UniProtKB/Swiss-Prot annotation:
InterPro entries noted in UniProt: Cyt_trans-like (IPR004821), NadD/NMNAT (IPR005248), Rossmann-like_a/b/a_fold (IPR014729)
Substrates-to-products reaction catalysed: nicotinate beta-D-ribonucleotide + ATP + H(+) = deamido-NAD(+) + diphosphate
Principal EC category: transferase
Family: Belongs to the NadD family.
E.C. number: 2.7.7.18
Domain of life: Bacteria
Provenance organism: Brucella suis biovar 1 (strain 1330)
Encoding gene, per UniProt annotation: nadD
Function description: Catalyzes the reversible adenylation of nicotinate mononucleotide (NaMN) to nicotinic acid adenine dinucleotide (NaAD).
Entry keyword set: ATP-binding, NAD, Nucleotide-binding, Nucleotidyltransferase, Pyridine nucleotide biosynthesis, Transferase
Protein name according to UniProt: Probable nicotinate-nucleotide adenylyltransferase
Length: 194
């Protein structure tokens, strides 16, 4: 079985996230995609973070494909960092082929993640195109550090079975939706407190 692991704050989840998930399922030939809603992101301000239960509920609404399984694995495992979550998932599922799925907009800061090199050395990574990231991804530290491990996207269907480090950049339809922009719109609509 091949499973994509797609983690994020999803604050809020939106059609752009669903598009990334659908592209990953189709292009990577995944049996399932685990949409992993994190309790929080150590690199982001948590003051605007909706509750985990709310983000899970909204993710369930956005993720319509039955192959997408919305989870709160980090909360269940009581871990904070992706590297720890992925190690626990792999240990609990030794017969599953996993691939880490991320939107290209996250690639610029991937080198700031706790033990990011460990993630890249232990999991194949699929980077899905996002607006404004198509060309800039090449200058990211991850792309430069692991340039010899990049696969042409035509090999995306076999990525999950490749020995890491291995990664690919997948082009395709892009959504301009952004959680940050959606939160700003919500703040403008919210009644002011006087």
């Amino acid at each position: 079985m091949t499973v994509g692991l797609f983690g994020g704050s999803f604050n809020p989840p939106h059609g752009g996230h669903a598009l990334v998930a659908e592209i990953a399922i189709r292009r990577l030939k995944l049996d399932q995609l685990w949409w992993m809603v994190t309790p929080g992101n150590p690199l982001k301000d948590s003051r605007e973070l909706a509750s985990l239960s709310e983000r899970l509920r909204l993710s369930e609404e956005v993720a319509e494909d039955p192959r997408i399984k919305v989870t709160a694995l980090e909360a269940a495992f009581h871990v904070r960092y992706t590297a720890d979550t992925l190690a626990l998932i792999r240990n609990a599922n030794p017969d599953v082929y996993f691939v880490w799925v991320m939107g290209a907009d996250n690639l610029a800061s991937f080198h700031r993640w706790q033990r990011w090199r460990e993630i890249a050395q232990n999991f194949p990574i699929a980077i899905i195109d996002r607006p404004g990231s198509t060309l800039s991804y090449l200058s990211s530290r991850m792309a430069q550090t692991f340039s010899d491990s990049r696969l042409d996207e035509r090999y995306a269907p076999v990525l999950a079975r490749r020995m890491p480090p291995a990664w690919t950049f997948i082009h395709g339809p892009r959504s301009s939706l952004s959680s940050t922009a959606l939160r700003k719109v919500q703040l403008k609509k919210a009644p002011s407190k006087k």
